A protein has these predicted regions:
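Alpha-helical scaffold segments in carbohydrate-active enzymes
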Residues: 36, 98, 115-118
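Active-site metal-coordination segments of metallo-dependent hydrolases
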Residues: 41-49, 81-91, 106
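Alpha-helical phosphate/pyrophosphate-handling elements in metalloenzyme active cores
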Residues: 39-70, 95-103
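Acidic/histidine metal-binding catalytic segments
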Residues: 26-29, 66-72, 103-116
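Conserved N-terminal diphosphate/IPP-binding helix and adjacent helical/loop segment
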Residues: 1-50
Length: 134
């Protein structure tokens, strides 16, 4: 798990540099995500799942129009997980909006939020980047 955590940290730091996140805020958001994905009720939606998603992302990021937005959507798409709740995706999108407020443009916040919400139904998407997420 330690190697996986190092890999996750490296991915996050690279994304933070690309998005020009201030160091202190970047670390706070990263810690928020680590805590969320380590919650005890999780069995599939864990840090291992995010590591697997990011491994696939690394293989296709050169094909994306907006790689940073897709990476953020991957990081946050299961950040809120209550097995009994019907609105995990919406709550994950809201968490991203709150955590990244002031770090991203309003347009990018809306895009990433919409992409996270789209993971609820996994319907076909018109946007090519979103197709990779789904």
């Amino acid at each position: 798990m330690q190697d996986s955590l190092k890999l996750l940290r490296r991915h996050w730091e690279e994304l933070s540099r690309r998005c020009v996140f201030p160091e202190q805020r970047s670390q706070a958001v990263f810690q928020l995500l680590l805590q969320a994905y380590a919650e005890p009720q999780r069995h599939y939606h864990t840090l291992q799942h995010i590591a697997e998603c990011l491994a696939l992302y690394s293989q296709i990021q050169h094909l994306l129009d907006d790689a940073p937005s897709l990476a953020l959507a991957l990081w946050f798409h299961d950040a809120v997980y209550d097995p009994q709740a019907p609105d995990n995706e919406e709550r994950s999108a809201a968490l991203m909006m709150q955590a990244c407020a002031g770090l991203l443009s309003d347009a990018q916040l809306r895009k990433v939020s919409a992409w996270i919400a789209a993971t609820k139904l996994h319907l076909c998407a018109d946007e090519s980047d979103l197709q990779y997420l789904l």
